[in-house]
Amino acid sequence: MMSLSTTLKPLSHFSPFVKRHNPKTNNTLFTLDTHNFTNSFWSKRGGSVSHRKHTVVAVYEAPDHVESSWRRLLSEVVVVRTKRSFWERSWTSWDVSKLVIFVGTHLLSLLAPFYFSWEAFWVFPWLVFINGICITLSYHRNLSHRSFDLPKWLEYLFAYGGVLAFQGDPIEWVSNHRYHHKHCETQRDPHSPTQGFWFSHMAWIFDTSSILENCGGEENVDDLVRQPFYRFLQRTVLLHMMAYSFLFYFCGGMPLLVWGIGITIAVRLHLTFLVNSVCHIWGTRAWNTSDFSKNNWWVAILTLGEGWHNNHHAFEFSARHGLEWWQLDITWCLIRFLEAIGLATNVKLPTETQMKGKALV
C-alpha cells in the first residue's frame, strides 16, 4: 500500500480519485484520495480506508489517452473509458466462435414459450445447478486456486462438466482467472470493472487478443498444460459442445434443446458473469484487500457461494468462500461432503491469524 500526497487534486468535486502521471510506464494512475472520501463514503459502509494513515485501497492504471472517467453509482469504482473502440480491432476465429455460441444460446432461449413442456422445464434448474457446481467447484476452486485435491478421475469428471457449461476449456478459463487475480482491476486485468460494467460482465470474453497482449499466453497454467486430458479438451472443446447439443435434440427434440441448452447456458453464463461485474462494484467489504472486491449476498445465493467475493480475494487459496456461518456457500458444502467421504483432501482454509491480519473491524 502507498501513501497519498495531500497536494494532489481530485478528478472532480464528487470524485474521491486523484489522477496523476506515472513516469515509469507513461501511464495515468487513478488513486483513492482518502482525505475527501473517508468520512463521506467509507465511514458509512465500514470500508478499509484509514483516515489517519491515508491508505490507498486500490490503484488503477490506465493509458494516458483517457477519454473520460466517472465513479460508478453507489460504488467507489472509477470507470475509465479509453478511445479504443471495442470494434476497432481484429477478431480471432475463437472470438467469433464464442460470439456465435453466446448469441446462439440467447436466441435459442427466446423460443422457450413456443417449445414449453414440463419435462423439459424441470431439466433446466437441475442443469443450471450441475453446470454451476462444475464451474465453481472444478474450474474455480479446484483448478484455478488448488484449494483442495481430488482423485484424478473425479477431477476430470468435474472438469468435463465445466466444458458442458459452455464456458470454454479448463486451460483458457483457469489462465484468465489467474491473470485476473494477478492484475486485479488494472489495465492488465482480463475483465476489469474500470473498463465498464458490460465489459467486465461479458464483452471481455470476445477479445482474446487483448488478453494475450496484456497478460501473456498460458504459461501461468503449466500444471494443466502438462496433462494430456486438458490439452485434449482445449483442442476439441467445440466438438463436445456440439455433441452435447445434438444429444439433447436427439433425446427430447426442440423442447429439450431450448430448455436444456438455450435457457440453461444463457442463465449460467450470466450468473458466472455477475461475479466478475457486480461483485467488483456493489456490496460490502469485510477484508482489507488491494482491490474493490465485494461480498454480495444475492449473487452468492445465485452462484452457489461465489458472491462472497471479498472473502475470496482476501484468501484466494480458501476452499470456503462463505467464511461466516450465515454466508450460504453451497459449493463449500459439497467440498465438505467430499472431504468427509475421503474424496477431497488437502482442503485449504484461512487461519485465525491470517483472518485477523486482514479484518477491517
UniProtKB/Swiss-Prot annotation:
Required co-factor(s) are: Fe(2+)
- Biological process (GO), any one: unsaturated fatty acid biosynthetic process
What note about domains is in the entry? The histidine box domains are involved in binding the catalytic metal ions.
Which keywords belong to this entry? Chloroplast, Fatty acid biosynthesis, Fatty acid metabolism, Iron, Lipid biosynthesis, Lipid metabolism, Membrane, Oxidoreductase, Plastid, Transit peptide, Transmembrane, Transmembrane helix
Q: Where are the transmembrane segments?
A: 99-118, 122-139, 246-266
Looking up InterPro entries in the UniProt record yields:
Acyl-CoA_DS, FA_desaturase_dom
Q: Where is this motif: Histidine box-3?
A: 309-313
Q: Name one GO molecular function term.
A: oxidoreductase activity, acting on paired donors, with oxidation of a pair of donors resulting in the reduction of molecular oxygen to two molecules of water
The annotated phenotype of a deletion mutant is: No visible phenotype and wild-type levels of both Hexadeca 7,10,13-trienoic acid (16:3(7Z,10Z,13Z)) and leaf chlorophyll content.
Write out the pathway annotation from the protein's UniProt entry: Lipid metabolism; polyunsaturated fatty acid biosynthesis
Organism, by scientific name, is: Arabidopsis thaliana (Mouse-ear cress)
**Which portion of the chain is the transit peptide?**
1-57
Per the similarity annotation, which family is this? Answer: Belongs to the fatty acid desaturase type 1 family.
Gene Ontology CC entries for this record: chloroplast membrane
Protein name as catalogued: Probable lipid desaturase ADS3.2, chloroplastic
What's the Enzyme Commission number for this chain?
Answer: 1.14.19.-
Record Pfam families: FA_desaturase (PF00487)
